[in-house]
A protein has these predicted regions:
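Structural and coupling elements of P-loop NTPases
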Residues: 1-381
Length: 381
C-alpha cells in the first residue's frame, strides 16, 4: 500500500446497534475500492473484517477491525466495531483513534439503543459524524420515518443529503439533495440521471430547506442572500457542509443497501469531501530533548510520537500494537521512547492491517493508523 500524507487521510469509526449493517458496509467499501475482488457476506462467514472463528460462528463482530480503503487520492482507515454491548470497550478504543464517525442505522429497525449509545460516544470524543441508513432495498423500510426519529432526538443538526426513489415499492434510485437531481440505478452501484417524481417534491423541499439554513448560517453574506431568496451554488453548499460537519453543527444522513453496493460510493465521496483530516484534531507529544509536552496535532514536521490504542494477539505472528501516529513520520527501525515504561523501544517492521492481513509499509505519516509487531514493553494507551 502507498504512503499517504496527513491531509489525504480520513480515520472513520463505524458505530451502531448490533446487526445494523456495519460489517456489510465495510465489506462494500473494501470491494468498491478494489481492496477485495469479491463481495463477502456476514452470513457466509467470509467478510474482510469478521475473520475470527468466534465471529464467523456468531455471525457478528466481537472486536474492532481496521480496513484501510483507498478512494480517489485519499486513504480511509475504516474501523469496524462490534455493536453488542458486551464489547463496548472495543468501540471506545476505536473511537479514541478516529477523527470522525459513521453511525449505521438499520432502516428496518430504525433508531435503537445502540444508535443512541453511538451518538453518546461521538459526543464523548467530540467526533464529527454522519448517519448511514441501511436496508433500503427492503420493501417495508421507511427512510422518512428514520429521519423523523433522528430529528426528534437530535433536532436541526440532522440534515439528509439523499432520499430514496421507489417504484411499486422497490428501491430504484435516489435524489441528491445538494445537487437537486435524481439518479436511477441501472446495475448495482452504476446509475444514470433521471427526473424527480412529483411524489418526492414535498420532502425534497423540506430536506433542502434544512440544508439551505445551514449554509446561510456560515456567513453574514450568505444569510443576506438566503433571506433575499437567492440560490446557493453546489460548490457553496458543499463548502458550507464541510465546515458544519467538521464542527458538528450538522449531521448528514445518507442511505443505501451495502449488500447491493447501492449508496456506498456516495458515502465514500461524502467521507472524503466532508470529514476533516487528522490535522484538525488536537493531541499532545513529548520532546525527549527537553522533556517538554508539545502540541503534536498530527503535524508531520514535528518530533515523532504515537499512541497505542489497541493490542491484538495473532496465534501465528504474535502481538501487534495498533498505533495512531500523533506527529512526525515513523519509519521501520526507528527508536521511540516509551513514556510509561521510561525506556526506549526499537521498532521492527511497520504494517497496515487489511482485516487479518498485515501489509508491510516503509513509513507512516502523522495521523495515519498502522501496526507494529512484537513490541516488548509497550501497552495499550
Amino acid at each position: 500500500m502507498d504512503v499517504f500524507r496527513t491531509d489525504r487521510i480520513r480515520n472513520v469509526v463505524l458505530l451502531g446497534h448490533s446487526g445494523s449493517g456495519k460489517t456489510s458496509l465495510t465489506e462494500a467499501m473494501a470491494y468498491l475500492s478494489g481492496m477485495t475482488n469479491r463481495l463477502g457476506k456476514v452470513t457466509d462467514g467470509n467478510t474482510v473484517s469478521d475473520f475470527d472463528k468466534e465471529e464467523i460462528k456468531r455471525k457478528c463482530s466481537i472486536s474492532t477491525t481496521l480496513v484501510p480503503v483507498v478512494w480517489g487520492k485519499n486513504k480511509i482507515n475504516v474501523l469496524d466495531t462490534p455493536g453488542m454491548f458486551d464489547f463496548v470497550g472495543e468501540a471506545q478504543e476505536a473511537a479514541s483513534a478516529a477523527d470522525a464517525a459513521v453511525i449505521v442505522v438499520s432502516g428496518k429497525a430504525g433508531v435503537q439503543v445502540g444508535t443512541q449509545k453511538a451518538w453518546e460516544l461521538c459526543e464523548k470524543y467530540n467526533l464529527p459524524r454522519m448517519i448511514f441508513v441501511t436496508e433500503m432495498d427492503q420493501d417495508d423500510v421507511s427512510y422518512r420515518e428514520v429521519v423523523e426519529q433522528l430529528t426528534e432526538l437530535y433536532g436541526k443538526r440532522i440534515a439528509p443529503l439523499h432520499m430514496p426513489l421507489r417504484e411499486n415499492g422497490k428501491f430504484v434510485g435516489y435524489i441528491n439533495i445538494v445537487k437537486n437531481k435524481g439518479r436511477r440505478y441501472i446495475e448495482k452501484d452504476k446509475k444514470e440521471e433521471c427526473p424527480i417524481p412529483d411524489y418526492s417534491v414535498e420532502y425534497l423541499e423540506k430536506y433542502r430547506e434544512t440544508l439551505m439554513e445551514s449554509v446561510a448560517e456560515t456567513s453574514e453574506e450568505f444569510m443576506d442572500r438566503y433571506f433575499g431568496g437567492e440560490e446557493f451554488s453546489v460548490a457553496e453548499i458543499s463548502a458550507a457542509l464541510a465546515m458544519n460537519v467538521g464542527d458538528g453543527t450538522i449531521v448528514p444522513v445518507c442511505m443505501g443497501s451495502p449488500v447491493n453496493l447501492q449508496g456506498v460510493s456516495n458515502l465514500l465521496d461524502d467521507i472524503c469531501g466532508y470529514f476533516p483530516d487528522p490535522s484538525t484534531r488536537p493531541c499532545a507529544g513529548i520532546n525527549l530533548n527537553t522533556n517538554e509536552i508539545f502540541e503534536a496535532n498530527y503535524d508531520f514536521a514535528k518530533p515523532k510520537s504515537a499512541t497505542i490504542f489497541k493490542t491484538i494477539v495473532d496465534p501465528f505472528l504474535g502481538k501487534y500494537s495498533m498505533i495512531k501516529v500523533c506527529s512526525g513520520v515513523i519509519k521501520s527501525d526507528d527508536v521511540l521512547y516509551n513514556v510509561d515504561q521510561e525506556s526506549e523501544e526499537k521498532l521492527s517492521k511497520l504494517y497496515v492491517l487489511e482485516g487479518s492481513k498485515p501489509i508491510e509499509v516503509p513509513e507512516l505519516h502523522a495521523g495515519d493508523i498502522g501496526a507494529i509487531a512484537k513490541l516488548g514493553d509497550a501497552r495499550t494507551g
